[in-house]
Swiss-Prot record:
Keyword hit for Chloroplast: no
InterPro entries: ATPase_NBD, Heat_shock_70_CS, Hsp_70_fam
Keyword terms, alphabetized: ATP-binding, Nucleotide-binding, Stress response
An example Gene Ontology molecular-function term: ATP binding
Species the sequence originates in: Drosophila simulans (Fruit fly)
SUPFAM superfamilies in the record: Actin-like ATPase domain (SSF53067)
Gene3D superfamilies: 3.30.30.30, 3.30.420.40, Actin, Chain A, domain 4
Sequence similarity: Belongs to the heat shock protein 70 family.
The protein, known as: Heat shock 70 kDa protein cognate 1
Length: 214
């Protein structure tokens, strides 16, 4: 009797994906945009609900109604110090209902052995360690640099922060294959252009404890 294929779904903090195991190998399934990962974003407009790439692509124009990082709230109280820290990076509003979390979740990673059936060997993870954590460190670093250079605090401007975060995401990807990345944002805040660069060594220094925790 031929073996049936198995489907695995990764609902990640930042990105989600679906894979199928068949013919002895795993294949990651592309979404309707042709991408193998889908941003864990949902957005609400006056006429529709957007999910994934469509939601993330319009976040700069609709920051207050675009939700992401939802997994960071799982199992935590609203007054949790970690939640309060994360809220500084969210353009949308989060609020409490009796101070209690309304959703729960499980760990992120499971190790299985697959023969005739499957056996779970280990389960572990950290719902509060994802790509956004690395982005946040770089965003905070550049917010401080902008204030030091120009004497302006863009930390409370949601649109400026979103543009800066998008640039940081691109820089992070560049640093995976290059030793330095440039960040150039015209009229980032109050008409001030922001041009800077970050080295891979500096990025690793900013995120040293996160790398050690992976």
């Amino acid at each position: 009797m031929p073996k049936l294929p198995a489907v695995g779904i990764d609902l990640g903090t930042t990105y989600s994906c679906v894979g199928v195991f068949q013919h002895g190998k795993v294949e990651i399934i592309a979404n309707d945009q042709g991408n193998r990962t889908t941003p864990s974003y949902v957005a609400f407009t006056e006429s529709e609900r957007l999910i994934g790439d469509a939601a993330k692509n319009q976040v700069a124009m609709n920051p207050n109604n675009t939700i992401f990082d939802a997994k960071r709230l799982i199992g935590r109280r609203f007054d949790d110090a970690t939640v309060q820290s994360d809220m500084k990076h969210w353009p949308f509003e989060a609020f409490a209902e009796n101070g209690k979390p309304r959703i729960r979740g499980t760990f992120d990673v499971s190790v299985l052995t697959i023969e005739d059936g499957f056996e779970v060997k280990a389960t572990a993870g950290d719902t509060h360690l994802g790509r956004e954590d690395f982005d946040n460190r770089l965003v905070n670093h550049l917010v401080q640099e902008f204030q030091r250079k120009h004497g302006k605090d863009l930390g409370q401007n949601k649109r400026a922060l979103r543009r800066l975060r998008t640039a940081c995401e691109r820089a992070k990807r560049t640093l995976s294959s290059s030793t330095q990345a440039s960040i150039e944002i015209d009229s980032l805040f109050e008409g001030v252009d922001f041009y800077t660069s970050v080295t891979r060594a500096r990025f690793e220094e900013l995120n040293g404890d996160l790398f050690r925790g992976t």
